């Protein structure tokens, strides 16, 4: 399968551009949403078969997990594992990423709703505080997580679940990155937060700026680096995780 490359704003646009599908694989669905003002997003619900995560790019988001609502600012992260009740709303103009891992039919649900049809996917309406305990939920303010330092890079683990490993990489100029490689058991993808890192995908080298997205499906050769001169930050998403977060720990010990 060919790699996916979306420059800023690109992807499958729905609801007049308010939601853009960046990735739609069996293993994960990633959307980028823009809420122009404070408004409701999703009422309390849970997913039986997948985790639901959020990363705020701009503005403010209020995320309910179990029976507790937390306010997320740019750079903050939240994750509701399987069967944990959650919902969200924007508190101002807000732009954020939403990760469903595995996809759970979320992308097709959005397409159906965009056509005016009922839709439906792995989602069950529920009261706050019902369902599985929220003790396994993840909340990290901007910059927080498990910080692992390596040569010319810092990797901050935001989520390390069976369904997904989500890492925020800070890449100094000169970060060489891994050699081109493939995965035979998961999708590896990247969202550029800052700078202009370089990606190798489908035998091409691309310098991509903030707001760009790259996905390497199973069997797709890929790599990433930061030739500089600026520092770069990227979100790296492995779905399923296949223990990538544990391998990072080993490399950093």
Segments from the language model and where they lie:
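A short, N-terminal "cap"/entry segment at the start of jelly-roll beta-barrel domains
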Residues: 1-29, 114-165, 173, 253
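Short acidic-glycine-tyrosine-enriched beta hairpin
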Residues: 5-6, 67-83, 203-219
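Short histidine-centered beta-strand/loop micro-motifs
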Residues: 21-24, 42-48, 89-90, 157-159, ...
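Ligand-binding loop in jelly-roll beta-barrel domains
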Residues: 26, 82-107, 218-244
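Conserved short histidine dyad/triad with adjacent acidic residue
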Residues: 31-47, 150-152, 167-183
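Glycine- and acidic-residue-biased ligand/ion/polar-headgroup-sensing regions
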Residues: 49-61, 66, 185-197, 202
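A cytosolic small-molecule/anion-sensing beta-strand core signal
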Residues: 57-58, 73-74, 92, 193-194, ...
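A hydrophobic/aromatic-rich effector-binding and dimerization subdomain
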Residues: 91, 98-132, 236-237, 241-252
């Amino acid at each position: 399968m060919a790699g996916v490359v979306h420059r800023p704003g690109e992807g499958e646009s729905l609801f007049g551009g308010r939601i853009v599908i960046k990735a739609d694989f069996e293993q994960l669905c990633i959307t980028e949403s823009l809420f122009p003002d404070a408004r409701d997003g999703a009422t309390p619900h849970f997913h039986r078969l997948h985790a639901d995560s959020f990363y705020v790019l701009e503005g403010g988001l209020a995320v309910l997990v179990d029976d507790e609502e937390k306010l997320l600012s740019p750079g903050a992260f939240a994750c509701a594992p399987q069967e944990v009740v959650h919902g969200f709303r924007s508190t101002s103009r807000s732009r954020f990423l939403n990760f469903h891992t595995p996809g759970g039919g979320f992308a097709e649900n959005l397409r159906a709703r965009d056509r005016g049809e009922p839709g439906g996917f792995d989602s069950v309406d529920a009261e706050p505080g019902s369902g599985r305990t929220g003790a396994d939920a993840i909340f990290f303010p901007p910059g927080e997580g498990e910080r692992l330092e390596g040569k010319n890079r810092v990797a901050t683990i935001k989520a390390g679940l069976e369904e997904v490993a989500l890492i925020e990489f800070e890449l100094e100029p000169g970060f060489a990155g891994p050699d081109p490689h493939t995965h035979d058991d998961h999708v590896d993808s990247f969202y550029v937060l800052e700078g202009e890192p370089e990606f190798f995908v489908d035998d091409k080298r691309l310098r991509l700026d903030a707001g760009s997205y790259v996905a390497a499906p199973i069997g797709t050769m890929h790599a990433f680096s930061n030739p500089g001169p600026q520092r770069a930050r990227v979100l790296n998403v492995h779905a399923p995780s296949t223990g990538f977060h544990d391998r990072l720990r080993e490399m950093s010990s």
